[in-house]
């Protein structure tokens, strides 16, 4: 039976009204057992809401175009709900596993993880339980048949109603051992798990590198580390580090680094060598290289930090060290407008991209955190209208936002030289027009003060 628009509107209005009443209550008159019982009610409601979201997400994904959404589904959810892109991606993937589906003929289909979806819909399991079950299912070897998979999923969903997520994870591990006692995995299974993630920078600038590597990559890393991570090799603490040949006995003896530190320095040296070799060719019209933006004031004071085209905050000491072997460029701005670019090496059109790295730092669409390395150059005034490529009429746009300019969105420059993104009327819900993510200092500056 299909619900009417009026029924849906009334139900959500009633939900909001009921929640408002609950928010206005005080609980001083209750006993401890009664308070615990109410917390169970809250947990049940919290667990049930995703079931509603799954259906909505799947219907939007099936029935909407990118023009109607203003981009890809995950990006739209992240911006509209003000959640991270990774969280939006997780919700889309979870909806695909637990949400209601339809066949190509329009016939309703049960969720892929039927038992888990049912338990969630009744509020018997929460996000933690769902995460354990989904991870278990996606980790199963490809040779496990559908009947066995469905039975294992039913068993885990039943156990999830009685145990905490951490306890359920241990049960899932035991079931995995029973189904695959010999640890037989195919190349397809390993390929599905492969991946490396460079985490966000901590307050000290350090980042965590995590993930899973294939046996082939592991063997390659071992061979490289055996050479470059040996004691005395690639030691940044030495004035003339040994990067070729064999280190002297004295270099090896004076090397006080731990094995993990030597591994780190070896990887850094090898990647730096690859960058300087020129064998990587070009990326977005520029030679593959590290591009750092900083201010003349910070350079003269030897304090502060620079910002790379990938969004990394680089201490000024590292900037100066890298600059010893780099081509230098000086970009001059009047507020948001580019005046000139001076450089120590002759450039042609790539100069405009360097200027945009210095000015925009990343995608100029409001709220977007994609750094400059992964952006395309966008004509604020369509090229078909202006017929020229003026750096003050250019901006950076990521692969998700750049196409929006041809799907009803318009862009323009304001008086400060910043790019404004104007959505079509059906997508306009009062969101910001200018991106300040890459330039948080603008939020702290007075409107009439220094840029």
From Swiss-Prot:
One GO cellular component, as annotated: peptidoglycan-based cell wall
InterPro entries: DUF222, HNH_nuc
SMART domains noted in UniProt: HNHc
A Pfam family assignment: DUF222
Highest taxon of the lineage: Bacteria
Region (Disordered): 415-435
Family the entry assigns: Belongs to the Rv1128c/1148c/1588c/1702c/1945/3466 family.
Stated name of the protein: Uncharacterized protein Rv1128c
Organism: Mycobacterium tuberculosis (strain ATCC 25618 / H37Rv)
């Amino acid at each position: 039976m299909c619900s009417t628009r009026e029924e849906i509107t009334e139900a959500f209005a009633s939900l909001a009204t009921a929640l408002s009443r609950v928010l206005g209550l005080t609980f001083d008159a209750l006993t401890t057992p009664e308070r615990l019982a109410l917390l169970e009610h809250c947990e049940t409601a919290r667990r049930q809401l995703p079931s509603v979201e799954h259906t909505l997400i799947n219907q939007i994904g099936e029935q909407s175009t990118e023009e109607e959404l203003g981009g890809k589904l995950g990006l739209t959810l992240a911006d509209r709900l003000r959640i991270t892109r990774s969280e939006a991606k997780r919700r889309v993937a979870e909806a695909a596993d637990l949400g209601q589906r339809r066949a190509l003929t329009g016939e309703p289909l049960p969720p892929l993880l039927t038992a888990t979806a049912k338990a969630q819909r009744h509020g018997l399991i929460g996000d933690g339980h769902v995460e354990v079950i989904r991870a278990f299912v996606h980790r199963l070897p490809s040779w496990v048949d559908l009947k066995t998979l469905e039975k294992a999923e039913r068993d885990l969903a039943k156990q999830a109603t009685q145990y905490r997520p951490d306890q359920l994870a241990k049960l899932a591990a035991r079931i995995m051992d029973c189904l695959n006692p010999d640890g037989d995995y195919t190349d397809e299974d390993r390929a599905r798990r492969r991946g490396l993630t460079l985490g966000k920078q901590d307050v000290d600038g350090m980042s965590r590198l995590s993930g899973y590597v294939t046996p082939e990559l592991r063997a390659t890393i071992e061979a490289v580390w055996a050479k470059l991570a040996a004691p005395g090799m690639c030691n940044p603490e030495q004035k003339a580090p040994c990067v070729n040949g064999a280190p002297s006995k004295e270099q090896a003896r004076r090397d006080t680094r731990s094995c993990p530190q030597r591994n780190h320095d070896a990887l850094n040296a090898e990647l730096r060598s690859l960058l300087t070799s020129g064998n990587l060719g070009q990326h977005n019209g520029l030679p593959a290289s590290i591009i750092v933006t900083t201010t003349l004031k910070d350079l003269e004071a030897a304090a502060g930090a620079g910002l790379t085209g990938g969004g990394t905050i680089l201490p000024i000491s590292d900037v100066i060290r890298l600059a010893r072997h780099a081509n230098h460029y000086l970009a001059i701005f009047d507020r948001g407008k580019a005046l000139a670019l001076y450089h120590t090496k002759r450039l042609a059109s790539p100069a405009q991209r360097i200027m945009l790295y210095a000015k925009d730092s990343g995608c100029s669409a409001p709220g977007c955190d994609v750094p400059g390395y992964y952006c395309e150059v966008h004509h604020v005034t369509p090229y078909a209208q202006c017929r020229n490529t003026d750096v003050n009429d250019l901006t950076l746009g990521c692969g998700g936002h750049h196409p929006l300019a041809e799907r009803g969105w318009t862009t323009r420059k304001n008086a400060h030289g910043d790019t404004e993104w104007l959505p079509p009327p059906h997508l306009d819900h009062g969101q910001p027009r200018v991106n300040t993510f890459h330039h948080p200092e603008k939020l702290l500056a007075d409107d009439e003060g220094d840029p």
